[in-house]
């Protein structure tokens, strides 16, 4: 736990109210249950377009469960059920008739541990494109290159596209996973502690990449690292026991929290 607040620019810049900006996604009264365990309890959050929102909180607070709910990944867990609305493009996607394949194309996800396919670097990015019906080899190659460039990986792998993705370093593998996600041209990227398993240099590259990607995508990131949240996010939501304690601009939340629980957590006096 930190013993001091994350460093924030001493000149406090007031961040626009997230509800005043165009929303990429939102949840209304969202509940998630694992059997009898009530993991997420009536969460209302709005995610502004082309901004980075960080979800922070102690281990087991529900932030990763909430993130997985946003593109219905929790549906893959036996005994999990969800209630409430998950709004994307103004449509509630928390309905049985919704095509989850399309949901996950529009709302991409990158997990904590890099999980490249046991295929070539090229095939890792091209696989989803082919699955979605893209057949023209030139178009596929163009999309692969574009995606690898956006993930700041192209210059490192352009001469080795046929090599196994498993030959890459951990940081490169994670950027490959980001390239794989952006190749599907999503509008939203969900990042579940994407740098927690990486060394400091690779972490720095991922953070730089996040700052670049928000020009094209709305990014929602779970992180246990409050310094990282302060560096990369525009908005931050503090979760505790499955509820949102506080949600505001990142600079405001870290320099002038409105709730005592938030103050205690970011000051290292929690628990």
Curated annotation (Swiss-Prot):
Gene3D superfamilies: P-loop containing nucleotide triphosphate hydrolases. Its EC number is 7.3.2.1. It catalyses: phosphate(out) + ATP + H2O = ADP + 2 phosphate(in) + H(+). GO terms for cellular component: plasma membrane. One of its GO terms (molecular function) is ATPase-coupled phosphate ion transmembrane transporter activity. The keyword Transport applies. Transmembrane segments: none annotated. It is found in: Cell membrane. PROSITE patterns: ABC_TRANSPORTER_1, ABC_TRANSPORTER_2, PSTB. ATP binds at residues 57-64. The keyword Amino-acid biosynthesis does not apply. One of its GO terms (biological process) is phosphate ion transmembrane transport. It is a peripheral membrane protein. It is an enzyme of class 7 (translocase). It holds the Pfam family ABC_tran. Its main location: membrane. Residues 25-266 form the ABC transporter domain. The complex is composed of two ATP-binding proteins (PstB), two transmembrane proteins (PstC and PstA) and a solute-binding protein (PstS). Part of the ABC transporter complex PstSACB involved in phosphate import. Responsible for energy coupling to the transport system. Belongs to the ABC transporter superfamily. Phosphate importer (TC 3.A.1.7) family. This is Phosphate import ATP-binding protein PstB 2. It comes from Listeria monocytogenes serovar 1/2a (strain ATCC BAA-679 / EGD-e).
């Amino acid at each position: 736990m930190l013993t001091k607040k994350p460093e924030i620019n001493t000149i406090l810049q007031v961040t626009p109210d997230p509800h005043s900006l165009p929303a990429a996604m939102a949840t209304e009264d969202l509940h998630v249950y694992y059997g009898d365990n009530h993991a997420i309890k009536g969460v209302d959050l709005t995610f502004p377009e082309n901004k980075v929102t960080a979800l922070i909180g102690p281990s087991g607070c529900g932030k990763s469960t909430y993130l997985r709910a946003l593109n219905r990944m929790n549906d893959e867990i036996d005994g999990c059920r969800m209630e409430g609305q998950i709004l994307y493009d103004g449509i509630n996607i928390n309905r049985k008739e919704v095509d989850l394949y399309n949901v996950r194309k529009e709302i991409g996800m990158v997990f904590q541990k890099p999980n490249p396919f046991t295929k070539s670097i090229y095939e890792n990015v091209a696989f989803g494109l082919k699955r979605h019906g893209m057949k023209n080899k030139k178009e596929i190659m163009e999309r692969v290159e574009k995606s690898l460039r956006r993930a700041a990986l192209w210059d490192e792998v352009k001469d080795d596209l046929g090599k196994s993705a498993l030959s890459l370093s951990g940081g490169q593998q994670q950027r490959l996973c980001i390239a794989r996600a952006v190749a599907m041209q999503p509008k939203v990227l969900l990042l579940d502690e994407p740098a927690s398993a990486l060394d400091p240099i690779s972490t720095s590259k991922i953070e730089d990449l996040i700052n670049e990607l928000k020009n094209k995508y709305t990014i929602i990131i779970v992180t246990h690292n409050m310094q990282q949240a302060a560096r990369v996010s525009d908005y931050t939501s503090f979760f505790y026991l499955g509820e949102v304690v506080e949600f505001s601009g990142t600079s405001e939340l870290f320099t002038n929290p409105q709730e005592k629980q938030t103050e205690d957590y970011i000051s290292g006096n929690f628990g």
